[in-house]
Amino acid sequence: MTQLKKLYRKLSSLPAIAGLLLISASWAWTQAPAQPPQTDTATKPGASQPEQDQKRATGNASTQEQKISSKEAEELFRDVDDILRFASKDSGLPIKKEVKRRLTSRDEVVAYLEKTMAEDKDAQRLRRSELVLKKFGLLPRDFDLQTFLVALLREQVAGYYDMKTKTVNLLDWIDIEQQRPVLAHELTHALQDQSFGLEKWMKEGDNDLENKKQPTGMDIENDEISEARQAVVEGQAMVVLVDYMLAPTGQSLLASPQIVNALKEGMLVGTADSPEFKDAPVFLKEELTFPYRYGLDFETELLRTGGKEKAFAATLSNPPRTTRQIMEPKTYLSGESLEPMRLPDFERDFKNYERFDVGAIGEFDVAILVDQYAGTEASHNFYPHWRGGYYYAARPKGDPSAPLALLYVSRWASREKAAAFAAIYAQSLDKRYKHVHAVAQEGKDTLDDLQKLESLSGTHTWLTEEGPVVIDVKADSVLITESLDQPTTEQLEQELFGAFVATGK
């Protein structure tokens, strides 16, 4: 559906995002149930100014920003070892070496993150992501993704564990009481790193199709590995964070489902002090919080069914491969294997086009798309029926200003679900294009009133200001092309759906 994978991989390479982007949205909750375990602490200069502390915790810069004292910094440095021991006991992951620690300023962190973003090899992927996302209607056409991310970094920057230097970075502008639960989360990453080599472990799932001339069905199947692994890493860290916050009450994550639900709800809402996140498009909120929300649910289910060993070390040794396995842990536990998707001959079929992007459209991607165009309830009822999907984006050769052309193929659990998804996608056209007109077909009603559609079968075409949109539904599969010339669309239909046409299915 977009380069979703590559967009998230790009974001997750930034430590502050991978660390605690969403934690700032849950400060209200983390302060409510209990104070975290702690050593004796001196009174903080900012303790009588909770509103200011809250603002600092979410990362909003202020000309009056207060710094923690040298005594508080020393105390926080000592706390690292205590919290590391808690994280080790809670996760079962051993402490193999001391974790380096460093106190850093907001300016240093922001400069580091901006440098990482500018130099990262995925910078071009990010720009491609933006255009494909806009084609699917998941970002407004005038939205500047790069500007948004820079602003978000400044707003949401938080403490983080740096996998390259093996150092946990503590922040000199956030009250130490608020940094302790952050440390529980980040030191879990340090433990993961010590046992499994986190940077290499994540790269093993970094499956980029950009340089493959002819991706295979297995390539598409493996295209979500990085998201699934990120959800495991963040889900485990969230388990430890929740248990750390609940420890003074004698409770734990498994015994407090209502608290977990409240935390997850808060992740998507943000706070009054996080305007960039609060005002972000739905897609970005969902995408940025996916590994935390769904990762937490995934790990909770593994804890419930298999205990600590299964939820932590065993899952890091044998990680899930798709967002479907994260969203539906039973599919991971049962070892479900879906048949790879059939792919066309991209080089031949798109001989008149320059490839722009290609990738999987997984269960989570579909959940966001359906949520945006049919609502959250419909999304929750719909995404479990996903059985595969991919997209291919291209531009006509010699015409870089031409609209982005798109092929999207999806497979569903039944004919009925395929027909229902096709209708939802057709309904999105009115929201994504200024002018949409159904092409009359002999013997068929003209589908101009898209919002009345409940299901769609057969082949249908609409004209838009960016060219034709074709939706072809055959059995349990849906083929969609946008801004693609008719001969290419017909060739793709014949290649992928020829067997259905021949048998009349």
Regions of interest found by a model, annotated:
Residues 77-168, 172-177:
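Auxiliary, metal-adjacent structural segments of Zn-dependent hydrolase domains
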Residues 96-117, 204-214, 254-265, 319-321:
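Acidic helix-start/capping segments at beta-turn-to-alpha-helix junctions
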Residues 168-184, 225-228:
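Short pre-active-site segment immediately N-terminal to the catalytic Zn-binding motif
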Residues 187-203:
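Catalytic Zn2+-binding segment of zinc metalloproteases
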Residues 254, 263-403, 409:
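Pan-zinc metallopeptidase signature
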